Amino acid sequence: MQRHMLKSKIHRAAVTHCELHYEGSCAIDEDLLEAAGLIENERIDIWNINNGERFSTYAIKGERGSGMISLNGSAARRAQLGDLVIIAAFAMVDEAELQAGWKPKLVFIDDGNKIKGHRDHVPTQNWT
């Protein structure tokens, strides 16, 4: 059996550009792409923390070290500059890979869209 699992996540990235007439749907700083294990043309889901919008598109490379998160084409209508978003990708993972210790790549970034940490799991949510 295969399971559809979280593969990659870039958590709380700030939108730096919204380019309605640019080809390609989400340009992501190449450093962030690599850290999250994402590649060009990979399907991604974007969840806008500010307005609740959720949509799918694909990743393209943004300038390395720039902190770029550019929503392009129709995706530009789903956010405003400065909105915080979560960018995620999923993969089909078989039971053997899961048993062997397969883990997602979670990337946490600072206010300038620079990497501040990595994790391979989402912590248990507690009632507090």
From Swiss-Prot:
EC number: 4.1.1.11
EC main group: lyase
GO cellular component terms given for this protein: cytosol
Residues holding substrate: T57, G73, S74, A75
Note on how the cofactor is bound: Binds 1 pyruvoyl group covalently per subunit.
Task performed by this protein: Catalyzes the pyruvoyl-dependent decarboxylation of aspartate to produce beta-alanine.
Protein's name according to its UniProt entry: Aspartate 1-decarboxylase
Gene: panD
